[in-house]
Regions:
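Amphipathic, small/basic residue-rich leader segments at the start of a protein or domain
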Residues: 1-126, 147-150, 570
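Glycine-rich phosphate/cofactor-binding loops in nucleotide/flavin-utilizing enzymes
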Residues: 3-25, 382-458, 548-571
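Internal helix-loop-helix
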Residues: 83-149, 154, 197-200, 333, ...
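A short core secondary-structure module
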Residues: 185, 189-232
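Flexible, small-/acidic-enriched active-site or ligand-binding loops
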Residues: 228-257
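A glycine-rich, basic-preceded beta-loop-alpha segment at the flavin cofactor/substrate interface
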Residues: 250-283, 300-316, 441, 449-450, ...
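C-terminal helix-coil-helix/basic helical segment that borders enzyme active sites and/or dimer interfaces
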Residues: 333-364, 368, 375-385, 508-555
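C-terminal amphipathic alpha-helical interaction region
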Residues: 445-571
């Protein structure tokens, strides 16, 4: 038999929320501000000794520019990282790992990514969606559990292979698992594409369609990459995060024991609450952690650049536009940190699926704004490559690499726009199941908290937040009605995207306001909330607009090579 990890019917919904979560403010009629006060206090930011050793190795023996230039993390470097325990950060202590909490693990990956986004990404994949993290905790006792535990203790590298040439997340994977004649094993056949860690992994989770006599089922196969028939067809290279091990994989008759395929009684093992929770945390490790690392680097580079530059004898930092750039970058970094702390650093982070779902795009989008401002700021000395600046003896920073890396992080694992729309769909599904009927627009009118710990401007931001929260349930109902069917969702993706972005901005605003009550940094909070308020006004205006331009008609004309349109556009 295949291994069944859950006896009950799985669900495509994320696990019910039990801990205090911002989701209750959006959909449940209870802002619960007093619960949020103090709820996201950070754990110690001091890195464990083992992580400090990894960082020292990266600082003294690794050239991130060479990794980016050559597009490869050299095998000797990976071997050394293995020896230093970099692939056992999340492994339980009884297996020789550090057993880091999700928040501490995030900080470790962020620190590594501040040296090299590619290496940080690689560690995020392994420690986030590798089989030891995403699958082992749910496995019953047996040979598969024993295998993963043994290889984890050895410091294996892992990943997860789902995407295929036909796309990502298809209901039925085209990679198949057929039983052998005696029924003791499965034979796997198919291709997987864009698989991070695939070329260097020891064990891989692989999504398959199991073709048993009882009918097809989706399964998760655990594959030893040393098995005959496993092949890395090509190493893939990207615009950013260059050097990340990523490949086109082929399984050509790979035979694995029958109990190395995991299924559920009904449904898809990819969509169980436990698996989805692991996936959401992994997205933060893989994308949000490097994004925050890049944003912090840009803030440091901006400060150093501004401190040494003068115009007409006046320090650059005395100019209004420069001050606004530095303040905006600082506020973005603090907001990202606040969202991460709320999502992972508070008690019961596993319950906060909403925060983790939106934190990925919150961090990557904020980091993209920081990088863009930094390019403009440092562009005053020339939009020049690091290599060119070194040639002429000018102070240099790897800003070009950061620019490419953040663009990659915004699309890795799913295009950013689509991620916002999908997050909104998950939110609407939750609303349909749990939201109280007839929630009034003034549901929060009598629940405004005392604001003695906030500055007058931030107190106004808090009141604005409550007003947005009051109107959000009605917006959910409206967008839900517009996108009720499959056809409507395809034709009305933009309202979903807008709803997702509104929710994301509200989450960030709440996180920084709650943080301001803890640490007293009112000015940074004000800068972020003011910028977020302008973004929210635009998003609400678009969502409420009675009609829109004919985007569909223009797109059809462009795709059909309409002669008149082509002539107008010079195509």
């Amino acid at each position: 038999m295949t291994v069944q990890v859950f006896a009950e019917r799985p669900t495509t919904q994320v696990a019910p929320t039990f801990a205090p979560t911002f989701l209750t403010a959006l959909t449940g009629g209870d802002p619960a501000w007093d619960v949020r006060r103090g709820a996201s206090a950070p754990e110690s930011v001091e890195q464990p000794t083992e992580v400090v050793r990894i960082l020292a190795f990266l600082d003294t023996e690794v050239d991130p520019d060479a990794v980016d230039r050559e597009g490869e993390i050299p095998p000797f470097l990976i071997a050394r990282l293995r020896d230093l325990g970099a692939f056992r950060l999340a492994t339980s202590q009884d297996l020789g790992g550090l057993g880091l909490t999700p928040y501490t693990l995030f900080r470790a990956v962020e620190a590594v990514a501040s040296r090299s986004a590619a290496i940080g990404f690689m560690l995020g994949v392994h420690n986030g969606i590798g089989v030891a993290t995403s699958l082992l905790p749910t496995l019953p006792h047996g040979s598969l559990r024993d295998l993963i535990r043994r290889r984890s203790a050895e410091g294996m590298i892992s990943g997860f292979a789902d995407t295929e040439p036909a796309g990502q997340g298809n209901r039925w994977p085209r990679t198949t698992a057929d039983p052998t004649p005696d029924g003791s094993a499965y034979v796997l056949k198919g291709d997987k594409l864009f698989i991070s860690n695939g070329p260097v992994a020891d064990l891989l989770g692989v999504t398959v369609t199991v073709r048993d006599e009882d009918g097809p089922r989706v399964g998760l196969a655990v594959v030893d990459t040393r098995s005959p028939g496993f092949e890395v067809r090509a190493d893939l290279e990207y615009l950013g995060v260059r050097g990340l091990p990523n490949g086109w994989l082929r399984l050509k008759g790979v035979t694995i024991p029958r109990d190395h395929v995991v299924t559920v009684a009904q449904g898809d093992p990819r969509h169980t609450p436990e698996r989805m929770s692991a996936y959401l945390t992994a997205r933060m490790l893989i994308q949000a952690a490097p994004a925050l690392a890049i944003a912090r680097n840009c803030l440091r580079w901006s400060r150093e650049f501004t401190a040494r530059r003068r115009v007409d004898g006046i320090g650059l930092g005395e100019y209004d536009l420069i001050q606004r750039t530095l303040a905006a970058n600082a506020a973005e970094v603090r907001a990202m940190d606040a969202v991460v702390r709320w999502s992972l650093g508070a008690p019961a982070p596993g319950d906060r699926w909403f925060e983790r779902m939106f934190a990925r795009n919150f961090c990557t989008e904020a980091a993209a704004r920081v990088v863009d401002r930094t390019v403009s700021l440092l562009g005053g000395e020339g939009v020049e490559t690091d290599r060119s600046k070194r040639r002429r003896g000018a102070p240099s920073v790897p800003l070009e690499r950061a620019f490419r890396d953040i663009r990659m992080l915004r699309t890795a694992g799913g295009v950013d726009d689509l991620a916002d729309a999908q997050a909104a769909q998950a939110l609407l599904a939750h609303v349909a199941d749990t939201a109280p009927a007839g929630l009034a627009a003034d549901a929060f009118a009598d629940t405004l908290p005392a604001t003695e710990n906030l500055s007058p401007r931030n107190a106004r931001h808090l009141r604005d937040l409550y007003e947005d929260l009051a109107r959000f349930p009605a917006a959910c109902r409206d967008v839900g009605a517009r996108t009720a069917g499959e056809r409507e969702r395809r034709a009305q993706q933009y309202p979903l995207l807008l709803l997702g972005r509104i929710a994301r901005e509200l989450l960030g605003t709440a996180a920084v306001l709650a943080t301001a009550e803890q640490d007293g940094h009112q000015r940074l909070t004000d800068v972020h909330c003011t910028a977020a308020r302008f973004r929210l006004r635009d998003l609400w205006a678009q969502l409420d607009a009675p009609d829109h331009p004919d985007h569909a008609g223009i797109a059809r004309a462009v795709l059909s090579r309409d002669r008149h349109v082509d002539d107008l556009l010079g195509l």
